[in-house]
């Protein structure tokens, strides 16, 4: 089935999703399974970057993931600690894998790393004990450190460092919402959170504990310019606060959290300077 035929079948099935269940067979099930296989192999992805830097979302692939929850029944998933099992609808990406399959895939998966089927992991990625949800895309030579989460359909670029305990938000619903996107060569500091479709552009550095959502103000302290929903290329970002506004009683109100761009660097500086030096002010 061609990509256009897959898209058409999945769109039609999603419009009539109340009639899709574990007993559904034939074209709809085949189309959804084919779409998930394309995602799993990295041959299709939920979001793609155009030459002008704009990202477009393939909504039909998100629909395929959502339909899979209706199509697949709950089942026992073995491999838990102490020979325990899990109970879910989505199997592990590594189900049935042996040495040859791992060598062919070319990435490291440390014990405790969980990747759900339909997530793509590229060559030379290192997965510490972490969680990668379905539909996500993790590109080459990226590190996903311990206790970090890459949410459903999130797009992670090449040579990204996702530090310990980071949360990269996922998105399946609402359909019109875009996924979180971390472009190439970014550094995401420990315990940071990037959610609600925020885009972190190429080479940006987030210090430890930066929290970014769709409405978070990202203020350039040199120019005063404010960004929302996107971190500019090669920006170095730390947690900050905006001053409170006067309340009705005349007192200054509470401050509000924001993120602050403390500097911007070029590609050459970014590649030759340690993260600690970039964050030192």
UniProtKB/Swiss-Prot annotation:
Q: Name one GO cellular component term.
A: cytoplasm
UniProt cross-references to InterPro entries, sorted A to Z: DapD_Trfase_Hexpep_rpt_fam, Hexapep, THP_succinylTrfase_dom1, THP_succinylTrfase_N_sf, Trimer_LpxA-like_sf
Pathways involved: Amino-acid biosynthesis; L-lysine biosynthesis via DAP pathway; LL-2,6-diaminopimelate from (S)-tetrahydrodipicolinate (succinylase route): step 1/3
- Give UniProt keywords alphabetically: Acyltransferase, Amino-acid biosynthesis, Cytoplasm, Diaminopimelate biosynthesis, Lysine biosynthesis, Repeat, Transferase
Q: Does the keyword Cell division apply?
A: no
Which family is this protein grouped under? Belongs to the transferase hexapeptide repeat family.
What this protein is called in its record is 2,3,4,5-tetrahydropyridine-2,6-dicarboxylate N-succinyltransferase
């Amino acid at each position: 089935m061609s990509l256009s035929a897959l898209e058409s079948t999945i769109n039609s099935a999603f419009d009539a999703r109340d009639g899709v269940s574990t007993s559904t067979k034939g074209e709809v099930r085949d189309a959804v399974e084919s779409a998930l296989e394309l995602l799993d192999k990295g041959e299709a992805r939920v979001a793609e970057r155009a030459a002008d830097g704009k990202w477009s979302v393939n909504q039909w692939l998100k629909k395929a993931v959502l339909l899979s929850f209706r199509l697949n029944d709950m089942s026992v998933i073995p491999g838990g600690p102490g020979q325990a099992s899990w109970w879910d609808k989505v199997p592990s990406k590594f189900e049935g894998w042996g040495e040859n399959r791992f060598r062919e895939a070319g990435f490291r998966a440390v014990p405790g790393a969980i990747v759900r089927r339909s997530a793509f992991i590229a060559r030379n990625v290192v997965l510490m004990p972490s969680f990668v949800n379905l539909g996500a895309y993790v590109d080459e030579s990226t590190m996903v450190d311990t206790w970090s989460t890459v949410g459903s359909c999130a797009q992670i670029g090449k040579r990204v460092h996702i530090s310990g305990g980071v949360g990269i938000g996922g998105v399946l619903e609402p359909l019109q919402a875009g996924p979180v996107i971390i472009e190439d060569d970014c550094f995401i500091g420990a315990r940071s959170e990037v959610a609600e479709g925020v885009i972190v552009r190429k080479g940006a550095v987030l210090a430890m504990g930066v929290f970014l959502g769709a409405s978070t103000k990202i203020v350039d302290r040199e120019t005063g310019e404010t960004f929302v929903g996107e971190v500019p290329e090669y920006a170095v970002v730390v947690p900050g606060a905006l001053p409170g506004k006067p309340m009705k009683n005349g007192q200054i109100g509470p401050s509000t959290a924001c993120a602050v761009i403390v500097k911007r660097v070029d590609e050459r500086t970014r590649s030759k300077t340690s993260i600690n030096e970039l964050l030192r002010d």
